Amino acid sequence: MLEIAKRTALGALLLSVMPLLIWLSGWQWQPGASGPGLRFLFWMTETVTRPWGILTSAILCAWFLWCLRFRLKPALFLLAIMITAIVAGQYTKSWIKTLVQEPRPYVLWLEKTHGVPGDRFYQLDRQVVERLVADDNHIPLWLKRHWAFETGFAFPSGHTMFAASWALLGVGLLWPRRHRKTVALLMIWAAAVMGSRVLLGMHWPRDLLVATWISWMLVTLATWLAQRLCGPLTIPPDEHQEIAQREEEKKS
């Protein structure tokens, strides 16, 4: 358990660097940024936004099962553990949001520029939200629609919890099997999703940090359960020879 906690904690620390630096710098979100970079980050956000998040989870579940190659019964246990970790994170996020009820950055901006009180905003219809910013030409249409779709509270970030959980599951489950490229890609993807939430005006840096560490707790428990119920996460002895052969082929 301790080794798992150390491994996943290192992953959580790496994911925490970006939001922590933003928080310490005192940077504040303001609308008006646009361009292909922001649009790319929007598509990163969309990989988590429903319904695409379901497809992302299905693809990642299949990839994890292929990478670990457990037999049928352990594979089913692993599938259940991974899905439970992701779903538990989303339920935890929703429960905390209803308690804290922190407004999103763009909501406070609407309050200042359009005179919509923050406490009244969450009672408005989504179409009303889109009409409020219809005349703001410096805000892209796709961002207006995203704001209208995402009218929940900010703290903590559900998108971050989803992406960070999958990235940390990669650290916990796949790193011991030397699937380092997959882990690196998952970490980069999670960091891009997290960055998109700040730059799109959806979250504060602290929302990302808290979500990351909630994910760490859930994933650490999930990885420990997977090790107990599904078998060792390290490379099986019969695969060592295959790995050695692949490394020799690369050198030659």
Regions found by a protein language model. Give the residues of each.
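Alpha-helical transmembrane segments in multi-pass membrane proteins
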Residues: I81-A85, G89, K93, A211, ...
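N-terminal transmembrane-helix/juxtamembrane module of multi-pass inner/ER membrane proteins
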Residues: M1-W63, F70, F77, K93-H114, ...
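Residue-level signal for the membrane-embedded core of alpha-helical transmembrane segments
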Residues: P51-L55, V87, M161, S165
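Membrane-embedded catalytic cores of phosphoryl/pyrophosphoryl-handling enzymes
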Residues: L2, Q127-S252
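Low-complexity, proline/glycine-enriched hydrophobic segments characteristic of transmembrane helices
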Residues: T98-E150
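Cytoplasmic membrane-interface segments at the C-terminal ends of transmembrane helices
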Residues: W66-R69, L229
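Alpha-helical transmembrane segments of integral membrane proteins
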Residues: K6-G11, K73-A85, K181-L185, R206-V210
